[in-house]
Amino acid sequence: MKKYQTHIILTIIFCMMAFAAHARRMSPRDAFSDSVMCLVFKYSQSVDTTGRAEHKSYAYTKFQIKTNKRNATLMLVPTMYAVAHGGGRRFISEFYNQMTLDANGRPVAKRLLNISTIPHRSNTLSSVLKYMTPTVYGETLFETNILSPFHYKNRRYYKYAVTQLPFGKAQVYVYPRLKNTQVIEARAIVDSQSGKISMVDFEGEYDMTRFYISIIMGKDGFGSLSPARCSMRANFSFMGNKITGMYTTVYGLPKILSDSLNNVADTALMAKVRPIELNQDEADIYKKFYEKRKQITDSLNNNTPEKNFAKDILWDVIGDNVLNRISQGFGKQNQGYFRISPILNPLYMGYSERKGIVYKFDLKGGYRFTENLELGLRFKGGYSMKQHRFYFNIPLTFNYNPKHNGYLKLEIGNGNRISNNRVARKMLGISKPEDNDFLYPLFSEYPGLSLPEISTDIDANNRKLTEFKDDYLRLTNHWSFNDYVGFEIGLVSHQRKAVIESFYKLFNYPSKYVSVAPAVALELLPWGKKGSIFKIDYEKGWKNLLGSNIDYERVEADAQTIFQASRRQSYSVRLGAGFYTRKGDHWDFVDYTNFHDDNIPGGWNDSWSGEFELLPSQWYNASDYYIRGNFTYEAPMIATAWLPLIGKYIEAERLYVSSLVVNHLHPYTEWGYGVTTRAITLGFFAAFKNTKFNGIGCRFGFELFRDW
C-alpha cells in the first residue's frame, strides 16, 4: 500500500487542479448568467418594504369566459352551474377591489363593485382569479401552489438561460428540470445591474387549468415586488368540457369610491373607475345581454309568464343548490354567512379500509354580532356504505373574546359503535379470566339458547349483538391567558345504548350506560400561537351525576407540531399518552378523547397525518392505557413526481410512520406512502403487530375542486 501512496496523492492533486482550471475557464456568458440570477434571487431582500403592510390600493379586473364545448358533467364543477345551464356561450364580468396585504404579505381583495352577464352574478372559475395576484419573488407563486423560479430555494427544480440585452437589460429563460404541475416555464426581462424584474411571462398547468400569464411589474420601491398589470389566458378542461377565460387586472389605482361599498352592481360607477376601455367584443357581449334583459322585462310587463316547473324549480333552484356549493352572506353589512357543500355531487366521497366508501357533506354558518361576538355552527356528516351507518358531528361555537381566544362550544354527535371492553378483548383474542364471568350465562336457565362464539373472526351481523350506539354531548369553555397558556373547563356526557338490548339482558347486564364527567384541560404553547401545542386533559365521571351510572377517571397528554420548511416541505409530529386512573364497578367502556377512530374521514389536509389507518377498531376500546406517536413528511416531489408520464400529475407526496403501545401490542406500527393529484388522493399502508407483518391496506379520496 505504501508504494502506491505517492501515486494516489499525486492523482488527487492533479484532479483538483483540473477542476480548478475548469472553474477558471468559465465562459463570460456563464459568468454573466450566474451574476444576473444571483441578483434576481436577492432583489426582494434589497427593497425597503417599510409601510407596505399598511399600504392600501385599488385594482380593476375584467374577464371574458367563452364556452367552447360543454356537456352535462359541467354542472358537477363548482361555480360552473350557471355557465353549464345558461343559454349563452360568452360572458363578461368586471370587478373593482380594494387591495391590502395579510400578515404573510399576500394580497387580500375586498370587492367593492361587481357587474356581470353571468346569471345571478355567480362567481365562475373563481379559483383562477388567484393566478392574477402572483408573488413573483416568493417561494410559491399562487398562495401555497406553484414553486416560483425566482426564489433562491427553488433553483434546484429549474434550469436558467440568460441573454444579454442592450441598455443594461437581460432576458431570462426558465425551464423546469422535470414535468410536474408544481413547476412552470417562464421568460423575464431583468435589470442586469439590480436584478429587478420589469416584465415576466409564466406558462403552466394546475388543477385542470392551463394558464398563460403576462405581467408588468411595478416600477419603484416595494411596488416593484408586485404586478402593476397582469393579463392571462386560462384554458379549463374537464370530461370533454372546454372553457376559455381571458383576464386582465390593473393594480395601483387611486381611491375614487367609498370603501363602504360591498359587491355593488352599478354600471355607472364601474364606468367611472374603469382604467381601460372595453374592446368591441366585450362591448357587444354587454349590448346583447342588456337587450335580452330588456326584452324579458317588456314581455313580463305585457304578459303573465307561465311557470316551467322543470326549468324554474328542478333546474334553476334544486339543480344549482344540490350539485354545487351554496355560499351566501346575509345581514345589512354581510354579518352572517352560510356555506353548504354539494349534496348530490358524486365527487365528495372517500374510501378507507374499515368504513369502505364514505359519502360526506359539510354545512357551515356564522353570524357576527359585534367585533368581539360571533356565533358559528357546523354540521359535518358522512354515510358509510360498508357499515350502513350515518355519522354526524355538530359543533355550535360562541366566540366572545378574540383577543384571549375565548369561546363557548357545544358539540353533539354520534360516535363510532363501541363494544363493551370485555367483548372487545375477546374479539381481539386477549381476554382476561374475569371476562368469562360476563361472557357465559347460565344456559340452564334458557333451554335451547344458542349464542354466537365471540372471537377474533366474529362476522358483522353477530358483532351487532355486542355493540353499543354512542351519542355524546360536550360543553367546553376555552380561554387563553396569553399567547403561551390556555385553559379549558367543561362537561362531557355519553349515552351508550345496546344495538340489541336483549343480548345484554341475558347476562343480567345493563343495556344502557350514561356517563357524565366534568373535564379540564391545560394548553401550553412554548413558542406562541404558531408553534407546538402541548395539552393535558383530565376527565372524571361521577356516578349518579345527572343520571350517570358509570364512574371513572382518565388522564391524557397530547403534543402536536407542524414545521413548515422551504419548497413546500412540512414535518408533522404528534405524540400522546393516556390512561385510566380509576375504574368503577361497571368499568365496561374504554373511550379516549385523543385516541379514537375518526368516523368521518377527511381529505388530504384533514387528519391523515395523525391517525392509524389499519388498526382494528376494537383496539381503541380494549386497553386501559396507550402511548402513540405519528410522524409525517410532505414535499411536492419525493419519488413519484420524478417518474416519466405519471410524475407531472403529482401535486404532493407524503411519508407516514405511526407507532402505538397498548396492552398486548408492544408495539403496533404503520408505514405509509401517499400522493395527491388533481383528481384523487391515494395512500398505501403496511401494518406490523409486535414487529410481525400484519397486512396492507389503502385509502383514497376524491380531491377534485378542493380549492374551488
Predicted regions and their residues:
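Transmembrane beta-strand segments that form the barrel wall of outer-membrane beta-barrel proteins
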Residues: 197-204, 232, 339-351, 362, ...
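C-terminal outer-membrane beta-barrel translocator/porin domains of Gram-negative envelope proteins
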Residues: 407-413, 417, 423-427, 432-445, ...
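Residues on the lipid-exposed face of transmembrane beta-strands in outer-membrane beta-barrel proteins
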Residues: 359-365, 394-398, 475-479, 491, ...
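Structured extracytoplasmic
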Residues: 23-169, 178-183, 247-350, 463-484, ...
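Residues that define the transmembrane beta-barrel architecture of outer-membrane proteins
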Residues: 355-359, 388-392, 467-473, 510-518, ...
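Gly/Pro-enriched, hydrophobic low-complexity segments
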Residues: 159-266
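Short loop/turn motifs that connect adjacent beta-strands in outer-membrane beta-barrel proteins
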Residues: 326-340, 368-376, 401-409, 483-487, ...
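Outer-membrane beta-barrel transmembrane strands
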Residues: 353, 357, 365, 445-492, ...
